[in-house]
């Protein structure tokens, strides 16, 4: 059997049982408590018939409970399926059947999204759930045999007797979720051994230590935020998240707990730097700032390196690959943070449309090899064959869809994305999914969604709308209409009413929409 995550958890639970593994606000989970709680919940899952390769849905925000549910599923050989807790009923109606989840763990709500209501709105015959376990007050849980409180679930079915599953190297650890170009879910089969290997390698590169405390801005339910935290846990350190990002408490937490590693996106950094009295916070304990998820402007990197004296490590990664390439101020300071090099445990190619390597100075698609490249898109063999290539050595390469310039010295410069994806803050928004929801609005005849630059969130969502007749549509009206259907961050930031959506051979001509004289 291959090495597994639980080997590390069990080791640290024995060596440092009372050490805090995870802290979210004032809630703490020690290494010993982690082993105890995953045993109880894992045994409860087994008691209701969940076992090897069964899928366990999780629709919850950052919390101790989220972490315990995830690893309880892994402990018994089942596969956790983290879902964005901002997901509405339309998204969940596609996502849950696609995952084949038998049981789902939820909280009452997250932000303005009522998760219990979203699940309850689904037609039972259209989803696969046999049981919904709720971390909520009993009076909020539907009076239905399918629903049960988490407290009752563990009391009735749980015990302290739960063996740890022994996975093969390629056994699927979890299904990571992301939307496809039409909003149809893409489900990523994350390999257990490969994911462990890449997280260990990255933790070694960053020189993480057992006495480190890491504060993450990204969420647990995003593969990046989860994986970066695991890099620290594998060293026996402490990881910290917030239920929701708050710049003041983020800075106060760094100061209070002497945080040594902070994980940020460019958007979060802009918010932090604009916090009143930012200079009064003591950040002297921070030795590394770890960046992912968005383009990192040189101006922001320079503030952290030169003004704050903090090492900047910027990575391009994806849910399909884990870490891919890196820019590290300890080595690359003075160059653009969008100029990346491969790591010792990764490999890259830059190819043209015929899958041939391009020459230096040319632009092509980035191909990446790591041990952590997904084994497949679950339930989608066509997409798997298109995006995952296997070489003569049996190594899996991922076609990222990222466009890069191939520069001398093995450097690749990020140039953009080949897909119609809007990077709004730390979230990926597929324009086609927003268009599809807009077209269900009774006042809208046609719609086209694109992006435009935004000084804080990077890109904002722009919806060009052709109303029916003399109807008027406002952003506020769309926000109310989207509520409960799609995640709140998918609501268009800007609405432009037009007389007609210009098309050519059925395709929207965005270049005309963007011209001011057309609006």
PLM region spans:
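Conserved AMP-binding A3 loop
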Residues: 30-32, 173-197
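Conserved AMP-binding/adenylate-forming core of the ANL superfamily
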Residues: 2, 18-63, 67-71, 88-93, ...
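AMP-binding/adenylate-forming catalytic core of the ANL superfamily
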Residues: 87-97, 104-106, 262, 370, ...
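Conserved AMP-binding/adenylation subdomain of ANL enzymes
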Residues: 196-213, 221-261, 275
């Amino acid at each position: 059997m291959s090495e597994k995550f639980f080997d590390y958890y069990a080791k640290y639970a024995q060596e440092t049982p009372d050490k805090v593994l995870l802290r979210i606000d004032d809630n703490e989970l020690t290494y010993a408590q982690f082993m105890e709680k995953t045993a109880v919940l894992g045994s409860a899952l087994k008691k209701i018939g969940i076992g090897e390769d069964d899928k366990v849905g999780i629709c919850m925000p950052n919390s101790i409970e989220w972490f315990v549910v995830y690893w309880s599923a892994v402990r018994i050989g089942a596969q956790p399926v983290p879902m964005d807790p901002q997901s509405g009923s339309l998204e969940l109606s596609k996502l849950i059947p696609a995952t084949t989840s038998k049981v789902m763990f939820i909280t009452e709500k997250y932000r303005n999204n009522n998760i219990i209501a979203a699940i309850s709105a689904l037609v039972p015959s259209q989803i696969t759930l046999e049981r919904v376990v709720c971390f909520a007050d009993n009076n909020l849980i539907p009076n239905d045999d399918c629903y049960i409180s988490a407290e009752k679930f563990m009391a009735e079915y749980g015990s302290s007797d739960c063996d740890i599953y022994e996975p093969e190297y390629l056994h699927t650890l979890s299904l990571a979720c992301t939307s496809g170009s039409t909003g149809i879910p893409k489900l990523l089969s994350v390999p257990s051994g490969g994911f462990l290997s890449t997280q260990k390698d990255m933790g070694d590169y960053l020189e993480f230590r057992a006495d480190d405390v890491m504060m993450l801005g990204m969420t647990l339910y995003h593969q990046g935020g989860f994986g970066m935290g695991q890099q620290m846990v594998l060293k026996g350190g402490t990881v910290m998240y917030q239920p929701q990002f708050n710049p003041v408490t983020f800075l106060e937490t760094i100061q209070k707990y002497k945080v040594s590693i902070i994980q940020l996106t460019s958007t979060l950094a802009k918010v932090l730097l604009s916090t009143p009295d930012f200079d009064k916070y003591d950040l002297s304990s921070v030795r590394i700032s770890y960046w992912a998820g968005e383009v990192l402007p040189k101006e922001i990197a320079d503030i952290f390196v030169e003004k704050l004296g903090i090492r900047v490590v910027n990575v391009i990664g994806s849910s399909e690959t884990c870490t891919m390439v890196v820019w590290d101020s300890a080595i690359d300071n003075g160059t653009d943070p969008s100029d990346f090099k491969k790591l010792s445990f990764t490999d890259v190619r830059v190819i043209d449309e015929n899958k041939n390597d391009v020459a230096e100075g040319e632009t092509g698609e980035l191909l990446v090899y790591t041990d952590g490249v997904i084994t497949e898109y679950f339930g989608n063999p066509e997409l798997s064959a298109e995006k995952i290539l296997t070489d003569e050595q049996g190594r899996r390469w991922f076609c990222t869809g990222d466009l890069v310039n191939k520069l001398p010295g093995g450097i690749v410069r990020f140039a953009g994305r080949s897909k119609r994806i809007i990077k709004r803050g730390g979230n990926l928004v597929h324009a086609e999914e927003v268009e599809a929801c807009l077209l269900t609005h009774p006042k809208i005849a046609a719609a086209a969604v694109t992006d435009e630059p935004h000084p804080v969130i990077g890109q904002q969502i722009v919806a060009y709308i052709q109303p029916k007749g003399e109807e008027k549509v406002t952003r506020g009206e769309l926000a109310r209409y989207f509520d409960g259907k799609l995640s709140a961050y998918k609501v268009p930031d800007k609405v432009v009413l037009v007389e007609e959506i210009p098309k050519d051979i059925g395709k929207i001509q965005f270049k005309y929409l963007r011209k001011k004289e057309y609006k």
